[in-house]
Amino acid sequence: NSIIGQQISTKAHKTIWKKMVTVLGEITPQVIDSLSDEELQQFGITFKKAAYIKSAAQKVLSGELDIESLRTMSDEEVCTKLVELDGIGIWTAEMLMLFSMLRRNILSFGDLALVRGMRMVYHHKVINRQLFDRYKKRFSPYASVASLYFWAVAGGAIEGMKDYTSTNNKYDETVSYTHLTL
């Protein structure tokens, strides 16, 4: 699911996933392995993503990737293990930990919308790694909850909040905002 969502809109991701669940039922490594790359592509998945998804399913089936062992690992260990898979980078590993494994302390520096929400809440033009890590420490061990709030803010959940990154657009509006403290 997380590989499918890479670099596409949330709407497109949900559409593809819904189509897969409707046609295939429960999505398991066995189900994925039974499909050809071309069959996966018919759901709207790119050739590369189809190959990555098939490869991950095959590694689970062969025992090369033991899903159960991930449950006892630290977030850092899980991330390291997941990025060994083709097509899985840090952002995808973090999204898997957050949404599939329900890890409580995930705040992704690589997620543009999340960082945008953070800029909006704290009125920064830029959030560098050092500042991001300071905020993450503030939210630990429940940074995943902060992720959900920052995404909501970036998506417009709080009327009047603005992004402080300069776009150099003469049509940018200056609006009042409500300060949100998490």
Whereabouts are the PLM-identified features?
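Long, compositionally biased
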Residues: G63-D66, T80-K81, V121, D163-E173
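Short alpha-helical scaffolding segments that buttress acidic/His motifs in well-ordered protein cores
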Residues: I3-I4, I53-A57, L96, A146-F150
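Alpha-helical ds-nucleic-acid-binding substructure associated with the helix-hairpin-helix region
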Residues: I8-S9, H13-D86, R138-S140
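Conserved small/polar residues in nucleotide/adenosyl-binding loops
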Residues: T178-L182
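Long hydrophobic alpha-helical segments typical of transmembrane helices together
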Residues: D133-S176
